[in-house]
Amino acid sequence: MNKSNRIQTAELDWESIDGIEVPISKQFGDVYFSKDNGLLETRHVFLNGNDLSERLANLQDFEYFSVGETGFGTGLNILALWQLWQQVRPNNHSHLHAISVEKFPLSKADLIRALNVWDELRPLSKQLIEQYPFPLAGCHRLSFPEERFSIDLWLGDAQDIFPSMVKTKAVNAWFLDGFAPSCNPDMWEQNVLNNIVRLSDYGTTFASFSVAGILKRGLKAHGVDITRPRGFGHKREMLKAVWKAPVSEEILLEPVRDTFQFTQQRIAVIGAGIAGLSTAWAFAQRGHQVTLFERTVPLSGASGNPLALLNPKLCPIEQSHEHLMTLSWQHALNFYKNFQAFRPIQIQQMALKNAQDLLDLADQYPADIVTQQTSSLESDYPHILLTEAGAVSPHQLRDEILQHPGIELKIANITTLISFENKVQLKSGNETTLEADHVVVCCARESAALFENYPLLKPIRGQVSWVDNSFATLPLNEAYSYGGYCMQLNTSELILGASFYPNRDDQEVLLDDHVHNFELIHSVFPHYAKQLPPVEQWQGRASVRAQSPDYFPLVGKMQNESRISTFAGLGSKGFLFAPLCSEVLVAQILGEACPVPKSLLQKLDAQRFQKKVKPKKPYFKSQ
């Protein structure tokens, strides 16, 4: 993505026509939807133009259908698609996914105003607005599991975004929208159309209000068969097309990795920390049968602290489209909001070193999510405020996830994986415990016991402390980050963390670590720290994090054709990374759209250190 291409929200004029407010783009000098009836035009051009009523109504059980769009705009096309899905979707586990790109997203206030026109869409508009993303570049996944519907909204320039998309699943239908070619020629350039076709397959359909020569030539160059039926209203023609040509050699250079069959899958997840819990949840939400194995009790490792803080480290704004921590930030917030275990908070990030660099970095972000504000605690250090953050109660989250009817917890020590062509056998000692279609190993450093040449994960000891502070409590919706962190664990206790000792795996609670945590807070908030009880009265928990050599988690299959995957090495950011990374993992296994760009997927690749990681003998067999 071009460094100059920071996300700017759309600049709008508004025109009132027959009592209806129509937004007009100042950047492109064109309307966002028809002045006659934008919703009827969407149905005529995009829904009927792709024959979606019939196609969606006939989806098989567990079938995954994706629709791509070249300009999100007000979201009207996607909302009309969602409404149609509600009307015709079969009573099974099929899923509809939309992929849309937008260079100039509307502000949330403008989006609310634009969609207020459509009374019949209001229930859907409300749900969309609740998850509408920050104006930060990259992919933002909006999930509506009860609707069996999801949206990947990619913010940025289409010329950069479409080449960056991973083709794990071919797009079934396209809405070629995004202002007229005369107003927005960049959207219709050959590079964009080449990548739209790259992301498609035999039988993919296309529809557009435009029949401009640049569009027709671009599609015909790839063998797309075009017709021009009557357009909407006063428009004489529209474009309707289907790709009937054989797949070209260029397209075959990036094969679809979808080997998924439209049946319920039996999934085994080994390890019940946050990686395993989020993975189990992602599969179960799609209707698959999940068995979650844990050797002792869930959250017995580093995920089992009393509280988890969602505290992203900001990156330069031009890197946000491929920065794991930034992309995980809003995804995690949207994920945890579904649970009672989540507490929305604000985080004061203190600038202990290079203060001006942090302040300059904050200025690159939208002021409604990153700003500067006076701290509730007295300190000599400057700071920034993250207005959108959160804290999670891990044990409450565990209990909520394990209540899912599609997840079964089993206490067992899985010692052997035997992989066959169409299944994986799990053994505990000499006893076969389960046969599964896919296995995901989420055991942190212990994952290596099930593989040969598993990447080395560094142990990092960490201890959190908590102490009575009923005499001087902090606001429940505030946290402070300063190399360590502190916030209210509950209404009468303060939690502080965390010590950080690489290459140590001891887990005894130590007074020295309490002292370390005290010294961290005292160095930044000395007046407050002096009020805390002596460290001898503090309680704590020590655990060992697992960190990969390059600080990125291991996410994906251990061999290209294997039914065995891993998800491990999350370090100290497990609760931040897990929701997004589990979606990446599920996309690879089930053949769904990938919510991160190619560049980031390569950094997460579980095979990146050794491309030939093999299960220990005799774990891998063919039959």
Swiss-Prot record:
Q: Quick one: where's region tRNA (mnm(5)s(2)U34)-methyltransferase?
A: 1-244
| Keyword presence, Transferase | yes
What are its GO cellular component terms? cytoplasm
Which keywords are on file for this protein? Cytoplasm, FAD, Flavoprotein, Methyltransferase, Multifunctional enzyme, Oxidoreductase, S-adenosyl-L-methionine, Transferase, tRNA processing
Which residues lie in coiled coils? none
User: What are the protein's GO molecular function terms?
Assistant: flavin adenine dinucleotide binding; oxidoreductase activity, acting on the CH-NH group of donors; tRNA (5-methylaminomethyl-2-thiouridylate)(34)-methyltransferase activity
- Catalyzes what? 5-aminomethyl-2-thiouridine(34) in tRNA + S-adenosyl-L-methionine = 5-methylaminomethyl-2-thiouridine(34) in tRNA + S-adenosyl-L-homocysteine + H(+)
Please name the SUPFAM superfamilies in this protein's record: FAD-linked reductases, C-terminal domain (SSF54373), Nucleotide-binding domain (SSF51971)
Instruction: Give cofactor(s), names only.
Output: FAD
Protein name per the record: tRNA 5-methylaminomethyl-2-thiouridine biosynthesis bifunctional protein MnmC
List the gene name: mnmC
